[in-house]
């Protein structure tokens, strides 16, 4: 089940960001969702796949029907164990989305996807804030020189403080992090 990612460079010809593949004229990018456990990255992946028309119904990790969690143990435990991919069109792009495990026990599985990425989305739970594993992921992304979008999830939960969280992200990850919401929720 994990072979699909193992040879993604060769199979897809790993078309670098902004280049087109030979068999179609769409630009191809490869993006991965990375996060500490329970930050909501698989749910975010489901939402993206749904909004882009790849799936007709959003699954849920806690219901055992998430599109990218296909292994029986993943569905039983409600966790991602193996990195999975989905390919979908988005405007003039062809996007390969990789959903990766968030549990530290499966970090090697997550780390092997870093070699093929054009971009990463680092998901942080607004309720939990920056975790130790979040910082580890950030350092890995820096080491591999992968451009990162930080997505703060679960901001609707009680006790979240947007300004304090942004200050913590800037302190613990990078002072160059900026807020794209422009004050709009």
Locate predicted features:
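P-loop NTPase switch module centered on the Walker A-proximal segment
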Residues: 18-124, 128-130, 173, 177-179
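Conserved glycine-bearing catalytic or ligand-binding loops at nucleotide- and phosphate-handling centers
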Residues: 48, 158-161, 178-185
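Short, Lys/Arg-enriched N-terminal segments with co-localized hydrophobic residues
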Residues: 1-16
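Residue-level "edge-of-site" marker
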Residues: 87, 154, 183
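Conserved C-terminal guanine-recognition region of P-loop GTPase G domains, centered on the G4
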Residues: 124-176
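Non-catalytic, charged/low-complexity accessory segments that flank nucleotide-binding cores
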Residues: 13, 18, 22-26, 157-163
């Amino acid at each position: 089940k994990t072979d699909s990612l193992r040879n993604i460079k060769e199979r897809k010809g790993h078309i670098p960001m902004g280049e087109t593949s030979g068999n179609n004229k769409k630009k191809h990018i490869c993006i991965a969702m990375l996060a500490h456990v329970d930050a909501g990255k698989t749910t975010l992946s489901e939402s993206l796949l749904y909004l882009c028309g790849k799936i007709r119904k959003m699954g849920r990790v806690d219901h055992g029907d998430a599109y990218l969690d296909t292994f029986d143990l993943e569905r039983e435990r409600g966790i991602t164990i193996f990195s999975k991919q989905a390919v979908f069109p988005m405007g003039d792009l062809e996007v390969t989305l990789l959903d990766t495990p968030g549990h530290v026990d499966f970090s090697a599985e997550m780390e092997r996807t870093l070699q093929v990425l054009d971009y990463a989305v680092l998901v942080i739970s607004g309720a939990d804030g920056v975790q130790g594993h979040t910082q580890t992921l950030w350092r890995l992304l820096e080491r591999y020189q992968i451009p990162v979008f930080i997505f703060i999830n679960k901001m609707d939960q009680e006790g979240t403080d947007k300004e304090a969280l942004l200050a913590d992200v800037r302190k613990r990850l990078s002072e160059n992090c900026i807020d794209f919401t422009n004050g709009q929720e």
